[in-house]
Protein backbone atom coordinates (compact mmCIF):
# COMPACT_ATOMS: atom_id res chain seq x y z
CA UNK A 1 0.00 0.00 0.00
CA UNK A 2 1.26 3.48 -0.89
CA UNK A 3 1.23 6.00 1.94
CA UNK A 4 0.58 9.60 0.89
CA UNK A 5 1.24 12.35 3.41
CA UNK A 6 -0.64 15.58 2.76
CA UNK A 7 1.12 18.48 4.47
CA UNK A 8 -0.90 21.64 5.01
CA UNK A 9 1.09 24.72 5.96
CA UNK A 10 -1.85 26.48 7.53
CA UNK A 11 -5.29 25.80 8.95
CA UNK A 12 -7.06 28.03 6.43
CA UNK A 13 -8.38 27.13 2.98
CA UNK A 14 -5.25 25.05 2.34
CA UNK A 15 -6.21 22.76 5.22
CA UNK A 16 -9.65 22.39 3.65
CA UNK A 17 -7.97 21.64 0.31
CA UNK A 18 -5.77 19.05 2.05
CA UNK A 19 -8.81 17.28 3.46
CA UNK A 20 -10.55 17.37 0.06
CA UNK A 21 -7.49 15.68 -1.46
CA UNK A 22 -7.56 13.08 1.32
CA UNK A 23 -11.24 12.42 0.53
CA UNK A 24 -10.30 11.90 -3.13
CA UNK A 25 -7.96 9.05 -2.13
CA UNK A 26 -10.38 7.53 0.39
CA UNK A 27 -11.70 4.73 -1.85
CA UNK A 28 -8.63 4.19 -4.01
CA UNK A 29 -7.21 0.68 -3.82
CA UNK A 30 -3.66 0.42 -2.56
CA UNK A 31 -3.51 3.99 -1.26
CA UNK A 32 -3.70 5.39 2.24
CA UNK A 33 -3.51 9.10 2.93
CA UNK A 34 -3.26 11.30 5.97
CA UNK A 35 -3.25 15.04 6.59
CA UNK A 36 -1.10 17.04 8.96
CA UNK A 37 -1.12 20.78 9.57
CA UNK A 38 2.24 22.32 10.36
CA UNK A 39 0.42 24.70 12.70
CA UNK A 40 -0.14 21.73 15.04
CA UNK A 41 3.60 21.38 15.68
CA UNK A 42 5.86 23.56 17.78
CA UNK A 43 8.74 23.97 15.35
CA UNK A 44 11.42 26.47 16.33
CA UNK A 45 12.65 28.90 13.72
CA UNK A 46 15.60 27.26 11.98
CA UNK A 47 18.97 28.79 12.64
CA UNK A 48 22.37 27.08 12.33
CA UNK A 49 23.41 27.75 15.94
CA UNK A 50 20.26 26.02 17.21
CA UNK A 51 20.89 23.07 14.90
CA UNK A 52 24.44 22.79 16.27
CA UNK A 53 23.10 22.72 19.84
CA UNK A 54 20.64 19.94 18.98
CA UNK A 55 23.30 17.90 17.18
CA UNK A 56 25.78 18.37 20.01
CA UNK A 57 23.16 16.98 22.42
CA UNK A 58 22.10 14.25 19.96
CA UNK A 59 18.52 15.37 20.41
CA UNK A 60 16.17 17.35 18.21
CA UNK A 61 12.86 18.63 19.64
CA UNK A 62 10.06 16.09 19.71
CA UNK A 63 7.90 17.87 17.12
CA UNK A 64 10.78 18.06 14.63
CA UNK A 65 11.28 14.31 15.08
CA UNK A 66 7.53 13.65 14.65
CA UNK A 67 7.28 15.57 11.39
CA UNK A 68 10.57 14.11 10.13
CA UNK A 69 9.38 10.55 10.79
CA UNK A 70 6.02 11.19 9.10
CA UNK A 71 7.76 12.54 6.02
CA UNK A 72 10.38 9.78 5.89
CA UNK A 73 7.77 7.04 6.29
CA UNK A 74 5.61 8.36 3.45
CA UNK A 75 5.84 7.17 -0.15
CA UNK A 76 4.67 10.46 -1.63
CA UNK A 77 4.09 14.00 -0.42
CA UNK A 78 1.43 16.55 -1.25
CA UNK A 79 2.29 20.05 -0.05
CA UNK A 80 -0.64 22.47 0.35
CA UNK A 81 0.56 25.96 1.09
CA UNK A 82 -0.58 29.50 0.44
CA UNK A 83 1.55 31.77 -1.69
CA UNK A 84 3.33 34.40 0.38
CA UNK A 85 4.93 37.31 -1.48
CA UNK A 86 5.57 35.20 -4.56
CA UNK A 87 6.93 32.19 -2.65
CA UNK A 88 6.00 29.45 -0.22
CA UNK A 89 4.83 30.10 3.32
CA UNK A 90 7.46 30.72 6.00
CA UNK A 91 6.26 27.75 8.06
CA UNK A 92 6.80 25.42 5.09
CA UNK A 93 10.26 26.86 4.40
CA UNK A 94 11.07 26.30 8.07
CA UNK A 95 9.97 22.65 8.13
CA UNK A 96 11.87 21.85 4.93
CA UNK A 97 14.99 23.37 6.51
CA UNK A 98 14.57 21.32 9.69
CA UNK A 99 13.87 18.04 7.89
CA UNK A 100 16.90 18.46 5.66
CA UNK A 101 19.11 19.16 8.70
CA UNK A 102 17.64 16.64 11.19
CA UNK A 103 18.49 13.63 9.01
CA UNK A 104 21.85 11.93 8.49
CA UNK A 105 21.90 12.98 4.83
CA UNK A 106 20.03 16.17 3.91
CA UNK A 107 18.16 14.28 1.16
CA UNK A 108 16.84 11.46 3.40
CA UNK A 109 13.47 13.05 4.01
CA UNK A 110 12.71 13.73 0.38
CA UNK A 111 14.64 11.41 -1.94
CA UNK A 112 12.73 8.90 -4.08
CA UNK A 113 9.37 10.51 -3.27
CA UNK A 114 6.91 11.91 -5.74
CA UNK A 115 5.70 15.32 -4.64
CA UNK A 116 2.81 17.53 -5.63
CA UNK A 117 2.51 21.19 -4.74
CA UNK A 118 -0.90 22.79 -4.57
CA UNK A 119 -2.43 25.94 -3.17
CA UNK A 120 -5.65 27.65 -2.36
CA UNK A 121 -4.98 31.36 -2.52
CA UNK A 122 -7.26 34.35 -2.66
CA UNK A 123 -4.92 36.67 -4.51
Stretches with model-predicted labels:
Residues 1-81, 86-97, 101, 105:
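N-terminal beta1-alpha1-beta2 submodule of the flavodoxin-like/Rossmannoid cofactor-binding fold
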Residues 109-123:
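Short, glycine-/small-residue-rich phosphate/pyrophosphate-handling segment
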Amino acid sequence: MKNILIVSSTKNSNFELSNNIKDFFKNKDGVSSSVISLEDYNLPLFKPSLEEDYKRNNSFPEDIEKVKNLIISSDALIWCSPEYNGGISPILTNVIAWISRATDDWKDGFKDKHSLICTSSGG
